[in-house]
């Protein structure tokens, strides 16, 4: 069926509600809009669903959410796991509570109990809830840091991590097999509750989740000594982090926490920012203003679903605030956690620091310094979660810390997704620890550069929307795959990792070996002097991302090298546009 026929079927089928049909009636005659909304089903990929909210098969709406949930329910029943139920959380976005209930009622109609949070909660708490409740799966309604018009649907498995093989492909196949939207099961909320298939959760998960975070604290003595002297500015960017971040900091004894008032309350419009992303400087405008006003030591921002943390720290010498990238904050927290664990308890022989392939090589230097394993995984925190599960199942490997360059880390194993609530807590604890040594977090960062090397990493991306954009993204990857650059920015390419073909090719010797990781459409160029470039299509946005890293002899040298390599990458992009 073509897009026009699908459009007509939605427009005329009484199964679809009046508001949906009115929205579709309003685009009658607009061929481009009709095609964009109906040329495909919103793809249920390895990250679940993510798309613009609206009527149509290629949009986020109650019908696409029901379809995805019916596919998930079919898979759960297929593997005989329906007795354990599914936990459901949601963020502050438009339609998030409605989508959560639609998912719950579809599960209930399939005989699967849904545990639904009473109000918005952070992503990592959903991961924790799946484990705590012993659920088969979890659903999180969120589009993370995407613009306001987006929403999404992420699926977790029983270990609390987002779905990985074989469950991801199994669920994707079942979702694809649901072709008739009107055949999807649902039931009234009151009946689901009466039948014991819809249960509200809240404080019964919040309290043990916060307790698990507090178990991670290594130096309560330092917090007790100097917490009253530390000034912390925090913004939840209109999202889910407000209550849990403030709660855990307060319970530990941090009394000077200033919340950005304009961004404190949940709001799906994200009215103070165009893009609620803690990677973006714009997201910190209000936080920085408040930070300067109260003379804050550090400024924290969590994204709407509170799994990623952005940070600015004060330089006591100049009074300026420095932005920490996800690589910098991840290494700062990781070095603190691993270093203090070694000092207090010693490190296990099989201890491991896990990072994604696009994260900084400083992590490798930290692991080498402490004599622990550095393990690389594909991009996506689910692969870090998968590694923790592997450690538990084999009895080989002890998880110490995991991080991604995209501002996410996990300092414990209570959950299996990145946790900005825990990261905020650990960073504040680290600030207290270093303060007892007369150091700031910026001083600690400079000391890490001295110890491990001056690593500088960056990422740039090109956005290519719609049908044409999808084709262009594939064209770019094909061009690079067929014509690998011999050098980029003066750095000679010494090896090419093609994760789609599962090959690492030494460019000088021509020797080929496997990557050892699952296949993925990613190209990675190892280069001279420790430089590297990695190219991959985003799994959640219509973008191609270009990551790069260098190592310098000083901060200034690393900055200059990074800037030069970034220019070379942009020049490479220009040749393909």
How does the language model describe each region?
Residues 33-38, 42, 151-285, 289-290:
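Gly/Ser/Thr-enriched, mixed-charge loops and adjacent short helices
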Residues 85-91, 231-234, 410, 549:
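Short glycine-rich or small-residue beta-strand-to-loop segments that form or flank ligand, phosphate
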Residues 38-58, 143-146, 232, 236-248, ...:
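Conserved phosphate/anionic-ligand binding catalytic regions in large, soluble enzymes, centered on
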Residues 156-186, 327-350, 355-363, 420:
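Glycine-rich phosphate-binding loop plus the immediately following alpha-helix
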Residues 99-107, 150-157, 307-327, 363-366:
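Short Gly/Thr/Asp-enriched flexible loops that form oxyanion-binding sites at enzyme active sites
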Residues 5-103, 192-229, 240:
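An N-terminal, well-structured beta->alpha segment
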């Amino acid at each position: 069926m073509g897009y026009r026929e699908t459009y007509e079927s939605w427009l005329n089928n009484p199964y679809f509600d009046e508001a949906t049909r009115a929205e579709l009636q309003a685009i009658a005659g607009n061929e481009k809009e009709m095609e964009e909304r109906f040329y495909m089903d919103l793809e249920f990929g390895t990250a679940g669903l993510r798309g613009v909210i609206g009527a149509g098969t290629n949009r986020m709406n109650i019908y696409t959410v029901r379809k995805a949930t019916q596919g998930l329910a079919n898979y759960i029943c297929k593997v005989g796991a329906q007795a354990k139920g599914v936990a459901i959380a949601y963020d502050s976005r438009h339609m998030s509570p409605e989508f959560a209930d639609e998912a719950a009622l579809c599960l209930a109609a399939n005989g699967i109990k849904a545990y639904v949070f009473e109000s918005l909660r952070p992503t990592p708490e959903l991961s924790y809830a799946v484990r705590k409740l012993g659920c088969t799966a979890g659903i999180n309604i969120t589009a993370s840091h995407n613009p306001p018009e987006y929403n999404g649907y992420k699926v977790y498995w029983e270990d609390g991590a987002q779905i990985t093989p074989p469950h991801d492909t199994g669920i994707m196949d079942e979702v694809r097999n649901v072709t008739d939207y009107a055949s999807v099961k649902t039931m009234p909320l009151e009946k689901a509750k009466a039948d014991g298939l819809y249960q509200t959760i809240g404080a019964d998960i919040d309290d043990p989740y916060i307790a698990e975070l507090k178990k991670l604290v290594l130096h309560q003595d330092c917090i007790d000594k100097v917490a009253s002297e530390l000034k912390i500015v925090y913004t939840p960017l209109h999202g889910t982090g407000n209550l849990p971040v403030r709660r855990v900091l307060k319970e530990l004894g941090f009394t000077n926490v200033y919340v950005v008032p304009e961004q404190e309350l949940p709001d799906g419009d994200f009215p103070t920012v165009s893009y609620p992303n803690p990677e973006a400087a714009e997201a910190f405008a209000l936080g920085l203003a408040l930070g300067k006003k109260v003379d804050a030591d550090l400024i924290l921002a969590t994204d709407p679903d509170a799994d990623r943390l952005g940070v600015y720290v004060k330089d006591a010498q100049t009074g300026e605030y420095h932005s920490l990238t996800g690589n910098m904050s991840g290494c700062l927290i990781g070095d603190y956690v691993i270093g203090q664990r070694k000092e207090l308890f010693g490190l296990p022989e099989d201890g491991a620091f896990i990072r994604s392939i696009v994260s900084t090589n400083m992590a490798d230097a930290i692991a080498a310094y402490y004599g622990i394993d550095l393990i690389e995984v594909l991009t996506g925190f689910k692969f870090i979660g998968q590694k923790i599960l592997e450690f538990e199942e084999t009895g080989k490997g002890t998880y110490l810390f995991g991080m991604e360059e995209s501002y996410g880390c996990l300092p414990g194993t209570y959950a299996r997704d990145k946790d900005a609530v825990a990261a905020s807590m650990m960073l504040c604890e680290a600030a207290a620890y270093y303060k007892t040594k007369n150091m700031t977090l910026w001083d600690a960062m400079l000391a890490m550069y001295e110890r491990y090397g001056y690593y500088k990493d960056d990422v740039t991306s090109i956005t290519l929307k719609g049908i044409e954009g999808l084709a262009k993204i594939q064209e770019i990857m094909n061009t690079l795959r067929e014509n690998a650059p011999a050098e980029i920015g003066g750095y000679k390419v010494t090896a090419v990792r093609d994760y789609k073909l599962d090959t690492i090719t030494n460019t000088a010797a021509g020797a080929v070996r496997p990557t050892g990781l699952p296949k993925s459409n990613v190209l990675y160029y190892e280069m001279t002097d420790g430089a590297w470039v990695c190219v991959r299509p985003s799994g959640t946005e219509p973008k191609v991302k270009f990551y790069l890293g260098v190592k310098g002899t000083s901060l200034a040298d690393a900055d200059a090298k990074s800037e030069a390599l970034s220019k070379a990458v942009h020049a490479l992009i220009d040749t393909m546009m």
